[in-house]
């Protein structure tokens, strides 16, 4: 399906070129007619030359056209054509002559072999049967070679497919191993992050609790110190009152004792 746009573009280009050439031919039809007339004249001259060669006459000036004989350019053109005609004829007629010679030689060789076989007492039917048997054997050998090559190609294709499948399986195994390793790494990273996050949360909560306990203890200590500082002046005032009270009680007891001793005296 992907090769359709290039084919269409090439077809469009060919059609455009054909239309351009047709337009140019229509525009230059006079030159085309002159060229065709020249080709026809050259072909007629070549045919007449072949006829003259077949007859054994080489009188070129007798069969030249009147215009070519009068014009020096035409004479030079005909002279050049006469020089080129022999190699062109050899090129054109050489393969046909070679084929005719080969065919004649093979035909003569075949006739000579047939005459020799007939002289030896071997008929043509025997040789045809032998040739057909050899041909059948060659056909069987060719068929066997084709079958063997087809089987070898099939085996090689299967081997290539097996190698490709093994490579694909190896790649899949490697990919699976990599995926397993990546999964393990992911789980390890996830567990480590979870543990570190939980440890961090525990550490943060423990530090906050410790700080709160320390602050509470410091607050209680400060309150106790404040209460102690408030209680100390009261104790100092109470201790100062106790000696005065003891002194007053002693003085009262001293006054009472002499009064009690006087009657005894």
From Swiss-Prot:
InterPro entries: WBS28
UniProt entry tagged with the keyword Transport: no
The protein's name in its UniProt record: Transmembrane protein 270
UniProt KW Transmembrane helix keyword: yes
Main localisation: membrane
Gene name of this polypeptide: TMEM270
Protein keywords: Membrane, Transmembrane, Transmembrane helix
A single cellular component GO annotation: membrane
Residues in coiled coil: none
Membrane-related topology note: Multi-pass membrane protein
Biased composition (Low complexity): 237-253
Region (Disordered): 229-265
Organism name: Homo sapiens (Human)
Cellular compartment(s): Membrane
Pfam families found in the cross-reference section: WBS28 (PF15164)
Membrane-spanning ranges: 72-92, 130-150, 185-205
């Amino acid at each position: 399906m992907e090769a359709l746009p290039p084919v269409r573009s090439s077809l469009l280009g060919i059609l455009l070129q054909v239309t351009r050439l047709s337009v140019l031919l229509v525009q230059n039809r006079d030159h085309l007619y002159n060229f065709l007339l020249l080709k026809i004249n050259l072909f007629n001259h070549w045919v007449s030359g072949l006829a003259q060669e077949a007859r054994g006459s080489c009188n070129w000036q007798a069969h030249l056209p009147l215009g070519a004989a009068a014009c020096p350019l035409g004479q030079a053109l005909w002279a050049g054509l006469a020089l080129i005609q022999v190699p062109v004829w050899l090129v054109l007629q050489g393969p046909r002559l070679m084929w005719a010679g080969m065919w004649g030689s093979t035909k003569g060789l075949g006739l000579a072999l047939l005459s020799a076989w007939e002289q030896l007492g071997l008929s043509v039917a025997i040789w045809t049967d032998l040739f057909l048997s050899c041909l059948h054997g060659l056909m069987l050998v060719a068929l066997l070679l084709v079958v063997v090559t087809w089987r070898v190609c099939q085996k090689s294709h299967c081997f290539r497919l097996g190698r490709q499948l093994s490579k694909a399986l190896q790649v899949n195994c490697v990919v699976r191993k990599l995926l397993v390793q990546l999964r393990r790494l992911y789980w390890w990273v996830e567990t480590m992050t979870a543990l570190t996050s939980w440890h961090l949360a525990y550490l943060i909560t423990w530090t906050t609790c410790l700080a709160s306990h320390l602050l509470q203890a410091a607050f209680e200590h400060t309150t106790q110190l404040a209460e102690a500082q408030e209680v100390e002046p009261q104790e100092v005032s109470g201790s100062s009152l106790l000696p005065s009270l003891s002194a007053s009680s002693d003085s009262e007891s001293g006054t009472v004792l002499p009064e009690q001793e006087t009657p005894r005296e």
